[in-house]
């Protein structure tokens, strides 16, 4: 599985960065915009799980969003592009979580960690 991921990832990065974003820098924003607006209009909290570029982070903040950066412990950025872009996002983040790497049999521990973090965020945002 890791071999396949390492082989395919450069193609996906090239498509997403060097083709898709060159055609429309806001392509990912435009893709989720209607869903986010629908959630907000219906008192739901939209969650965007992958923000890679400064214009995406700026759009979230312009729409009263909160940005949580989750950094997995002992895992470096996947490539130079990710490393470079993540530095640009630092000014937009509201929270940073250092996420431990859990084993396959550690779901309860993972859930406990997530609940604790979400509780902390609720206290700050309240």
Predicted regions and their residues:
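Small-molecule kinase domains that catalyze NTP-dependent phosphoryl transfer to phosphate-bearing small molecules
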Residues: 26, 31, 54-126
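Receiver (REC) domain switch-region micro-motif
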Residues: 46-47, 96
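ATP-dependent small-molecule kinase phosphotransfer cores
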Residues: 1-43
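Short active-site oxyanion
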Residues: 44-46, 66
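Short His-Asn-centered micro-motif
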Residues: 49-51
